[in-house]
Amino acid sequence: MSLAAPLASALAPPSAPLAASPAAAQTAAPGLPIPGFWDPRRRPERPDLRLTLIRFMSEVDYPPFNYAGPDGNPAGFNVDLARAICDELKIACTMQMRRFDTLVESLAENRGDAAIASLAVSAETRRKVDFSDPYYRPVARFAARRGAGLDTVLPERIEGKTVAVVAGTAHEAYLRALFTEAAPKPYPTAEEARTALAKGEVDLLFGDGYSLAFWLNGTEASGCCVFVGGPFVESRYFGEGVGIAVKKGNDQLRLALNWALFRLWEKGKFADLWLKYFPVNPF
């Protein structure tokens, strides 16, 4: 069931695993790069926005980006970012929580104006919707139990190691293509994969770096595990970046979102929000 709440104002594998470049991020705190795609020399113009309401949509359950808070209302990084965008634009907004697989169709049918739900920009998604500028980039990470003796992860270093991964994901495809000597162990859900690592049923876990960072920092992990190796940012598997999706041709809203995102980054508010949700560095 959809919740609504008001807001205040087949891939060819690369030749080797691709790790993130430090130059792709802005450092806002010692040792913690903040992802960003904004160039201060390319300041977008303030839009002539004639909207009075933006109907945001987000995913139902993808913490820490989207989830239902204790009161049942939408919460998470994407929700707070939408709230900040509305404040910057001085426009009223609403938020609907929908299943991820319904968001693109909902935009096309005018059931919402913008989807802020960690939807990766790719050739396929660009055919269906238009995107704001990216505001972060998908990243994959390995995690291991503390004391496992793995300080880095290379294909030859994890030969024969059992690696938990969510079945049917880009992470499984990447693991099978690049780490051919490892032993993937697919699980139906990320929660089951994390539990397997915490219990020592597998040697490693490979998955989304952001949700893993959230887990590692939370009580559920109980300090069991740490990141090892990476990060990995191969765009052919994990996407070119994550933007806010709008209906094809809605340039007025897309440009307004670009302006608001730049302003939030320029003021340091994006970095503040990032640090709130990711005290454990996903990179």
Language-model region placement:
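Proline/Glycine/Serine-rich low-complexity intrinsically disordered segments
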Residues: 2-3, 7, 21, 26-283
